[in-house]
């Protein structure tokens, strides 16, 4: 059996793809990798929320899936829209890395909690900007785009004092020595899917290949958590462009999902938790999404989208 894998070209994307490829090879499956440029990689002077596409990092890979040029596409789960286009599905999730956000800097004495010292932090994530506004209002933010190495270089050249990034990406790139602060995911809640790698396929992929891929790659506990988080985001009709957040944890068969929504400045904050059996992951996520919408979330979403279009 041969599996053709599509991937973005960045170093982190290729690391994730090689991780998936190694899992397949260990089971005797022949593989090949096709690197693909996406609009999210090409348009670096515009914030993700303003590019105007939910699939900014996925559309080009999905085109290759639809054409039959590749069998699967490897993504950061956090980049995946909450609703996939017709004809595509997520067939596997890897064992999740630590989902926390970290502060990365070449200035080892940087203390984000010290409000007496001006600090500029690079991030283009609306969620991270909102969380900084809520918990660290003294911090100034600046948009920063590009792959991990590009962002680190921009920081060292003076664009900012530090960068706010996912621990998973920094760790996978071997840059742990640049971490100066790790944010607690219980308060600085990550986006849906952070730390997990997702495998996407055409719905037409042969059942034999799909089953073989799942057997090699899928991590059931991570999948359960991602199903809950993605159901929550789907109910909000959200993606990377809104400051929504959610984190599910599985203890035995008991699933706990915490999540919510913020205003762009972080001042308005809607948050709640739901729990239940892991087998009810999707229902738990939908229930939390309904709660958020019914308790000010619908009006807040309308306000956010109005601000983003003006």
From Swiss-Prot:
**Which positions carry the signal peptide feature in this UniProt record?**
none
The protein's annotated catalytic reaction(s) are:
4 porphobilinogen + H2O = hydroxymethylbilane + 4 NH4(+)
An example GO biological process term is: protoporphyrinogen IX biosynthetic process
Q: Give yes or no: UniProt keyword Transferase.
A: yes
Cofactor(s) for this UniProt protein: dipyrromethane
Instruction: Cite the SUPFAM superfamilies for this sequence.
Output: Periplasmic binding protein-like II (SSF53850), Porphobilinogen deaminase (hydroxymethylbilane synthase), C-terminal domain (SSF54782)
Q: Which GO terms describe its molecular function?
A: hydroxymethylbilane synthase activity
**Which Pfam families does the entry link to?**
Porphobil_deam (PF01379), Porphobil_deamC (PF03900)
Arranged from A to Z, the UniProt key words for this protein are: Porphyrin biosynthesis, Transferase
EC number(s) given by UniProt: 2.5.1.61
Q: How is the cofactor bound?
A: Binds 1 dipyrromethane group covalently.
PANTHER family to which the protein is assigned, alphabetical: PORPHOBILINOGEN DEAMINASE (PTHR11557:SF0)
What does the sequence similarity comment in the record state about its family?
Belongs to the HMBS family.
Would you tell me the protein name for this molecule?
Porphobilinogen deaminase
Organism per entry: Desulfosudis oleivorans (strain DSM 6200 / JCM 39069 / Hxd3) (Desulfococcus oleovorans)
For this protein's source organism, the top of the classification is: Bacteria, Pseudomonadati, Thermodesulfobacteriota, Desulfobacteria, Desulfobacterales
- What's the encoding gene here? hemC
